[in-house]
Amino acid sequence: MIVALKFILVAFVSYFIGTINFSKILSWYVRHKDITKIGSGNPGTMNMLRSYGFGLALLTFVAEVAKAGLTCLIFKLCFPEFGQLIYFFAGLFIMIGYIFPVWSKFKGGKGVACFAGVFLFSNLWYVALAWFAICFVLLIFIDYGCIISFTYIGGLAIGYTIYVWLEGVAYAWAITVIIWVLFALMIFKHHGNIKRLFNHTENKIDFKGKLKKVFCHKKGEQIIEEECVDQKPETEIVIEPKPTNQQTDSEVQKPQDEETPKQD
């Protein structure tokens, strides 16, 4: 009974933490716009990237990763007797809360950043981080974000499943089920992207172009600053006023008066 109550508590708290959507928060308070009404309409990292650029997208991703990962880690520390099981159980309900938030009529984001956060804070964080770096590089060459998302979440799901069985992790079967339920949720939320890929109508993100804008903008600001510092002040040109006709007549008349001798 106590065990059941612990899992119910974790599920309840994790769900409501998952409903916090940082793309909506940042879009509204930074740009004063509703992210669900621009771009693809999806309140997630990729739509933030398409709509606002690299900066806000990165901030959204980091916030979602931290939200999911830290929540799972806290519950694992609170209930250490369940090990990785309680960790991924919390991650599952964070994902459910993010994808089906009660506050938005159960219409939320696709959960890729939350999924990444669950694995980036796990005991295989270094593998998840290395795989993220590889997928980040691939994103420069592949303009379809959903393909990179499938590559990342699929690689993590396969890799962690192999790990729990090879290492004999406790509750390996339950952890495996949770991981693949998470993966199934990802596929379900991306069904529209899959259809558009086959119809050749999927939106491109132009990640390379957005990166160029970021670095070119910074480089341009640096060049302007250097030009302002190195720029020498221009020498002032003083223009003397021309004498008026009255001044010239008096100046001419004065020496003539001096030359004429006085008469007694």
Model-derived regions, located:
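N-terminal signal-anchor transmembrane alpha helix
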Residues: 5-30
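Alpha-helical transmembrane segments of multi-pass membrane proteins
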Residues: 14-17, 94-98, 135-139, 156, ...
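Interfacial segments of multi-pass membrane proteins
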Residues: 49-52, 75-79, 93, 112-142, ...
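Multi-pass membrane catalytic core of lipid/isoprenoid biosynthesis enzymes
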Residues: 50-76
